[in-house]
C-alpha cells in the first residue's frame, strides 16, 4: 500500500505543478536588484524561483555585469531543482560561450554531477532500486563528462571528487555488463554470454566485476563444450578471485541448470521471443560494491552541493502483499497502478 500512496502523491504533485501559474518577475527591477533577489532565492533554497529570475536577468541584461555569473548559477539552480536535463543544457551553453572563463571547470563538474544523479529521481529516493541493472546511458555520460573535467583541469578543486566518482561509475558499468551476461546465461545464449564476460575482463580491469566476468566465461564455455577455454578461465578465477560466489570449496558451481526446455522459437531468436519469467536476481560482489560506493560518493559531495537530508522513513515500511488480490483486479486497476481498484 505504501507504493500506491507514493504514486498518488507523485501524480498529485505533478498535477499541481502543471496547473500552477508561473512566477512573474517585476519588469521594473534593475539588474542588481534582480540578481540580488535570485541570490536570496538560492540562499533560501527556493530553486524554482531562482531559475525564473536568473533566466529573466540573462534575457533582460545579456551584456550586463552579472550576465556570465547568472548563466553559471543557472546551472546550479537547475541541478538543485532536480532538473538534470536543464542543468546539462545550461552547462553545455556556458562551456560553449565561455570556454576561457576562470570558473568553467565548475560548469564541467555540474554537468557531470547532473548526469550522475539523473537516474536518482523522486521514486528512487523511496523505492529500493538496483542501480547496476538500470540503463547505463546516464552513467556513461557522467563518466565521460568527469573525464573531460579531469583531463582539461587536472588541478581543479573539483577534480578529486570527479575522479572518485569515475571509479564508482566504472564499477557500475562493469556490474551492468555482468548482469547482461547472466541474462544471456539464463536465456542459454552462451556465445553472447561468453563474449560479454570476456568484455568485462578485457575492459574493466581492477573492478570487482572481473571475477564475475570470469565466472560467466567458465559457465558459458562449459555449456558450449569448449573445455580448454573453460579450464583456463577457471584457473584464472581460482588464482585471482578465490572468494568469488561461483566457487564453493574451490569448486565451480554453475548458476543455471543444464536442461533446455525452451521452444524452438525461443532457441531460434536467442531467447528474445519467449513468454517465460524474467531472469532471477543475481547477487554479485560487483553489485554490492557498486551500491556501497554510490552511498559513499553521496556523502563526499562538497558542502555547497550537498543535497538536503531526505526523510527515508518510508523505506522502513514494507508494502503489504497484494498477490491474493491481483487475480480479481480490473484492467482499470492495472492501468492506474492499483490507485483506483
Curated annotation (Swiss-Prot):
Chief place of localization: membrane
Xref: HAMAP family: OM_assembly_BamD
The entry's localization annotation reads: Cell outer membrane
Its gene is bamD
| Organism of provenance | Pseudomonas aeruginosa (strain ATCC 15692 / DSM 22644 / CIP 104116 / JCM 14847 / LMG 12228 / 1C / PRS 101 / PAO1)
- Which family does this protein fall into? Belongs to the BamD family.
Q: How does it assemble?
A: Part of the Bam complex.
Keywords assigned by UniProt, alphabetized: Cell outer membrane, Lipoprotein, Membrane, Palmitate, Signal
Give GO cellular component annotations, separated by semicolons. Bam protein complex
Give start-end ranges for the coiled-coil region(s): none
Alphabetical list of InterPro entries matching this protein? BamD, BamD-like, TPR-like_helical_dom_sf
Region entry Disordered, spans: 289-330
Protein's recorded name: Outer membrane protein assembly factor BamD
Residue ranges under compositional bias (Acidic residues)?
317-326
Q: Which residues, per the entry, are lipid-modified as N-palmitoyl cysteine?
A: 18
Q: Where is the composition biased (Basic and acidic residues)?
A: 289-316
GO BP terms: namely: Gram-negative-bacterium-type cell outer membrane assembly; protein insertion into membrane
Tell me the membrane topology, using the record's own terms.
Answer: Lipid-anchor
Any signal peptide, and if so, which residues?
Answer: 1-17
What biological function has been recorded for the protein in this entry? Part of the outer membrane protein assembly complex, which is involved in assembly and insertion of beta-barrel proteins into the outer membrane.
